[in-house]
Amino acid sequence: CVPKRKVSPSXRNMRXAHDXLT
């Protein structure tokens, strides 16, 4: 995943962000 705006929980973006990170 690509960090767009740090790690802001936003609907489906949350999964992405978390996938990425972990």
Curated annotation (Swiss-Prot):
GO terms for biological process: translation. InterPro entries: Ribosomal_bL32 (IPR002677), Ribosomal_zn-bd (IPR011332). Keywords: Ribonucleoprotein, Ribosomal protein. Residues 1-22 are annotated as: Disordered. GO terms for molecular function: structural constituent of ribosome. One of its GO terms (cellular component) is large ribosomal subunit. It comes from the Bacteria. The keyword tRNA-binding does not apply. Belongs to the bacterial ribosomal protein bL32 family. This is Large ribosomal subunit protein bL32. It comes from Brevundimonas vesicularis (Pseudomonas vesicularis).
